[in-house]
Amino acid sequence: LLIITACLALIGTVWAKEGYLVDKNTGCKYECLKLGDNDYCLRECKQQYGKGAGGYCYAFACWCTHLYEQAIVWPLPNKRCSGK
């Protein structure tokens, strides 16, 4: 039973949701300039998704990691970022 519980916890950690941080009003990704480790992205991901979230700059947009399964990430259905 202990081994099964440990395996389930590991699978949940490995398969945690990831995605681009999105502005729910505009449908646009949060932009960033400094690729890789980025304090701005980390702070914004934690603020929107909680203390357990991580974040960095990938392809000039904030990429959030360790999200809960229901977290809303880019792209939003039926909402396109105007002009981008």
Swiss-Prot record:
Tissue specificity statement from the Swiss-Prot or TrEMBL entry: Expressed by the venom gland.
InterPro entries: LCN-type_CS_alpha_beta_dom, Scorpion_toxin-like, Scorpion_toxin-like_sf, Scorpion_toxinL, Scorpion_toxinL/defensin
Cellular component, GO, one term: extracellular region
MF GO annotations: sodium channel inhibitor activity; toxin activity
Modified residues (Serine amide): 82
Keyword DNA-binding: no
UniProt superkingdom: Eukaryota
Family, as annotated: Belongs to the long (4 C-C) scorpion toxin superfamily. Sodium channel inhibitor family. Beta subfamily.
Domain (LCN-type CS-alpha/beta) ranges: 17-82
GO biological process: defense response
Recorded domain comment: Has the structural arrangement of an alpha-helix connected to antiparallel beta-sheets by disulfide bonds (CS-alpha/beta).
Designated name of the protein: Beta-mammal toxin Cn2
Organism: Centruroides noxius (Mexican scorpion)
Signal peptide (from-to): 1-16
Record's keyword terms, sorted: Amidation, Disulfide bond, Ion channel impairing toxin, Neurotoxin, Secreted, Signal, Toxin, Voltage-gated sodium channel impairing toxin
Stated role: Mammal beta-toxins bind voltage-independently at site-4 of sodium channels (Nav) and shift the activation voltage to more negative potentials. This toxin is active against mammals.
Disulfide partners: 28-81, 32-57, 41-62, 45-64
Localization (cell): Secreted
Pfam families hit by this protein: Toxin_3
Other known facts: Is neutralized by the single-chain antibody fragment 10FG2.
